[in-house]
A protein has these predicted regions:
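Acidic, metal/ion-coordinating pockets
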Residues: 20-354, 402, 406-417, 427, ...
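C-terminal motif of bacterial Sec signal peptides marking the signal peptidase cleavage site
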Residues: 16-18
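Non-catalytic terminal accessory segments
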Residues: 2, 7, 20-38, 44, ...
Length: 582
């Protein structure tokens, strides 16, 4: 394993193909400009790797200029390592910076081993800094600290160090400027600074790392107990002068929050951007030079000056799963201590395959990384290939979070089946928690790896009592325009219809159980996963239930449900009806 590189941290004071954006060089000042020219620093931007050690099963769609798009097979740690190495080559001054969600919501080959191999892969890639994302907290902050520091202390159901008996932790640094402990300190350092060169050619790059303020609503509360997640812009603005005072010539923000360009927007330009990050950036100190973002799983390279002329920084994001990287070149004037120019482009990490697209570069597999991934793949194979049942056909995961699918209904049916003994009448599953399709093998065979990919979080099931009026209020929360709009997948016998054209709070048109309208005064036993039970995804009504009973883990429920029949028929859709515009 590579040795830990020297990192300089600042103390907290007072507590696609070749889509490019380029910032024009600053005007030269003959009295102050170094005749040797600017110092070049290369940065590779990553985000939302999610433990995808192996190439994604499905190709990614790469939007092009003119409204066209191409499907490209991309990703895989061995190919990403090769791409990172290629884009760091040719210069002594380089950094690799990630904007969070390196771990969590991961495929079996990483998640089965508590994402230790995802950390190991990033070590081998030469990652320097990672701004923590919400998924870094999926197993709790203590387990996240273990991933940083190493060791084999157990913080959950699974035993650490199953493959690497001396797991040493991350060679790179986690950054969390807006995550504060009860003691008033940040959970991880908020900033770091990296210096290059010497004498008159010395330059320094300061980095601020942080996650989205809404993280507590996206993870199990026990995992972030005792932590406060502060305002993102305030955290950035408090640290910009610190970095400037420490001699930073360029300031980079890595933040796990993102923009939402219009669907089909090419990777270059801002387009009609939306998303929570925009409002944050409109409040950020203009002295920031570069923002590496994530969370929305979108790809873009945006000159934010086209949105707000007072803020001339570039904002980037490289999709998800290691399928892209952002190549960034900073030209720093060491005499004026400023960024003279900045160029950035997103690169598709096309892997070696039978149907490689000649329009995109192909990256060969890095041999050392391939061997490392193979070690974990072999260790996971016995568990992942174990048959757990059969289904009648392919079951795809939801596209939009409001889409009803047979897979979502299958999961809800399995959860209802597993909790009947607790009196369950209804099961509700959040579509955002369904992470992959289930594509059966020969004869309809489904493996443990298949169901794990679809539900990778290991949530337990909880059954509680709710009044009919609470249940209706819960259904309304799905459609609250102030939050993330998604509909539940629901179990057999339960149905509801909604109309987004109606006023907020009255968008549920009807709801019924076994054909009978929900009675606001009656009591109903409802099953949900432990994430929802704690108010996850903003569903606070779930917390108001009574007479709670804890059930099995969601994967065990699915396995038991599939085992009850030789072949389980996929349930029909039609339980959730969108009446908007009808």
């Amino acid at each position: 394993m590579p040795s830990r590189r020297a990192l300089a941290f600042l103390p907290l004071i007072a507590a696609l193909a070749a889509c490019t954006t380029t910032r024009a060089p600053a005007p030269a000042d003959s009295a102050t400009t170094d005749t040797a020219g600017p110092v070049t620093v290369k940065i590779v931007g990553l985000n939302d790797f999610h433990g995808n050690l192996e190439p994604l099963r499905r190709p990614i769609r790469v939007p092009l200029e003119g409204g066209e798009s191409r499907e490209v097979r991309a990703g895989g740690a061995a190919y990403l390592a090769s791409a990172v190495a290629r884009h760091r080559a040719g210069g002594d001054h380089s950094l690799v910076i990630a904007a969070g969600d390196l771990v969590g919501a991961s495929p079996l080959v990483s998640s089965l081993f508590l994402d230790e191999p995802a950390v190991g892969a990033m070590n081998r890639m030469g990652l320097d800094f990672n701004a923590v994302g919400n998924h870094e907290f999926d197993r709790g902050w203590r387990e996240l600290k273990r991933l940083q520091d190493g060791g084999c202390e157990r913080h959950g159901l699974r035993e650490p160090c199953a493959v690497e008996r001396d797991f040493a932790g991350a060679d790179f640094a986690f950054l969390a400027a807006n995550v504060v402990t009860e003691g008033g300190e940040t959970l991880f350092p908020g900033t770091a600074i990296r210096r290059f060169g010497s004498g008159e050619r010395a330059v320094a790059v300061g980095v601020i790392g942080l996650t989205l303020k809404d993280t507590p609503s996206l993870v199990t509360p026990s995992g972030v107990a005792g932590l406060t997640f502060g305002d993102e812009a305030e955290a950035i603005n408090a640290r910009v002068p610190q970095l400037s005072a420490a001699g930073a010539d360029a300031i980079v923000v890595a933040i796990h929050q993102g923009l939402e360009p219009e669907p089909g927007t090419p990777h270059t330009g801002c387009g009609a951007i939306a998303g929570p990050l925009r409002a944050i950036l409109e409040r950020v100190d203009p002295r920031v030079d570069l923002v590496i973002s994530g969370h929305t799983h979108r790809s873009y390279v945006c000159d934010f000056a086209t949105v707000d002329p007072a803020r001339g920084f570039t904002v980037t994001s490289a999709g998800y799963g290691g399928t892209l990287l952002t190549e960034i070149t900073l030209a720093i004037d060491p005499a004026r201590d400023t960024v003279a120019s900045l160029a950035a482009r997103n690169i598709v990490v096309q892997n070696e395959g039978e149907a490689a697209d000649p329009a995109f570069a192909v990256f060969p597999a890095d041999g050392e990384m391939a061997a490392y991934v193979a070690r974990y793949s072999q260790a996971a194979r016995a568990a992942s290939t174990r048959p757990v049942g059969r289904i009648s056909g392919p079951a795809r995961d939801p596209g939009p979070a409001t889409e009803e699918t047979a897979l979502g209904n299958l999961i809800a049916d399995a959860q209802l089946f597993a909790t009947r003994s607790a009196g369950a009448q209804i099961a509700l599953m959040n579509n955002s928690g369904i992470r992959a399709p289930i594509v059966p093998g020969p004869g309809g065979t489904v493996t443990f790896g298949d169901i794990f990919a679809a539900q990778p979080f290991g949530n337990t099931l909880v059954t509680r009592s709710y009044s009919g009026s609470q249940l209706l209020a819960l259904l309304e929360q799905q459609l609250d325009s102030d939050g993330f709009v998604q509909t539940f997948s629901v179990s057999e016998g339960f149905a509801f219809a909604y109309d987004m054209g109606r006023p907020e709070g009255s968008r549920i048109v009807s709801a019924s159980l076994d054909g009978q309208p929900i009675d606001p005064r009656a009591s109903y036993r409802v099953t949900m996963n432990s994430f929802l039970a704690a108010g996850g995804d903003g569903f606070t009504v779930f917390e108001r239930g009574t007479d709670g009973v804890t059930g099995p883990v969601d994967l065990d429920a699915m396995e038991a449900y599939l085992a009850q029949a030789e072949t389980t028929a996929l349930p029909p859709t039609g339980r959730v009806t969108d009446l908007t515009g009808r």
